[in-house]
Amino acid sequence: MEMYFKRMKDEWTGLVEQADPLIRAKAAEIAVAHAHYLSIEFYRIVRIDPHAEEFLSNEQVERQLKSAMERWIINVLSAQVDDVERLIQIQHTVAEVHARIGIPVEIVEMGFRVLKKILYPVIFSSDYSAAEKLQVYHFSINSIDIAMEVMTRAFTFSDSSASKEDENYRIFSLLENAEEEKERQIASILSWEIDIIYKILLDSDLGSSLPLSQADFGLWFNHKGRHYFSGIAEVGHISRLIQDFDGIFNQTMRNTRNLNNRSLRVKFLLQIRNTVSQIITLLRELFEEVSRHEVGMDVLTKLLNRRFLPTIFKREIAHANRTGTPLSVLIIDVDKFKEINDTWGHNTGDEILRKVSQAFYDNVHSSDYVFRYGGDEFIIVLTEASENETLRTAERIRSRVEKTKLKAANGEDIALSLSIGAAMFNGHPDYERLIQIADEALYIAKRRGRNRVELWKASL
């Protein structure tokens, strides 16, 4: 890639050097005068494509992209020789964002085609001479084409790397502590089954019972299991079993009086038992040949490390956008960790990180993700948790750690606490923005005295 970018730098520099300075000045004049119109028209046309619309539907994104597009047009069409290296880096950065969000390369290519199409009438409606218009158009189109080629090549490289990480994560997820995960999910679906059966047998209210897809097992399967075992036939079988039973469950819940009829009650109980039994059999088959593998895991805490953060965020953001379900993030700092580490030593610091990590696992659902983000900082991705549920989870974790007892080597008690920043997904497709606003909330928590939870709000 380095050699390629050097070659493109030489080509772009040559284009600028060989162009008549007057023509370059007129191209820059067109860009400055019409960038706002071109940006608005560009997004109006691009958003007609339903595939592109899903990436541009967020108001904040659209507002930011329009201003960014204006700057991009002015930068590319006003390029001087000294600007070329910086412009190539800009194309690379934009490509990385596109790959991170998951924008397909064909949409990027369509965007460049639209831009060249709407630029033509702008240039040819100017009061330049016919020869000048033609030269300005050729210089502008060649500049855009070079920028497009650099961006597309960088995008392909970034997207390929992301795809490899997606597959690496899938393999890691399959292998990571599989036996324990299998037993945990079997216990989860059995717990759901027992809860419903007891309520039916004791004539209790079923109103608080959840359909299988919304129970802990169903959430795990939809957010993790389907991805772990993608491409395996049993996944489709489990999906259909969950979907079919949810239909039966919802129909029963609409008229629970039918359960007073013994034959209907027995039929419903048998449907529950058969569904759970089949799912457990299929789960055992899926996990059968899986063994432990720790690549991608933080050795000290046994949490995920940040390697798979992009893969997971990209998938969960796509799921949240597709289903309309909530998504949230917690960024967590161990308060005064450096001071504790310096005072009591690294062994004590390591023990604190292990205890804190256990508190995370004990207070999240199996469909959630917990990462060691670096040092004493952690990220938790909460799937399908409302704002209230997000805050309750954060507060449970904070309270649990605050009550944790830890003694130093000399027997002295060490006080532990966490500062937590929370943020709700607001439709912005770039996960780094979600992390950024959660980090801003974390900063507020620290500024307000530590050992507290703060939720990011636009007014913060």
Swiss-Prot record:
SMART domains: GGDEF. Pathway: Purine metabolism; 3',5'-cyclic di-GMP biosynthesis. Heme binds at residue 98. GO terms for biological process: cell adhesion involved in single-species biofilm formation; negative regulation of bacterial-type flagellum-dependent cell motility. Binds 1 heme group per subunit. Binds 1 Mg(2+) ion per subunit. Its EC number is 2.7.7.65. Keywords: GTP-binding, Heme, Iron, Magnesium, Metal-binding, Nucleotide-binding, Transferase. The active site is at 376 (proton acceptor). It catalyses: 2 GTP = 3',3'-c-di-GMP + 2 diphosphate. Is composed of an N-terminal sensory globin-fold domain that binds heme and oxygen, and a C-terminal GGDEF diguanylate cyclase domain. This is Diguanylate cyclase DosC. The lineage of its organism: Bacteria, Pseudomonadati, Pseudomonadota, Gammaproteobacteria, Enterobacterales. The gene is dosC.
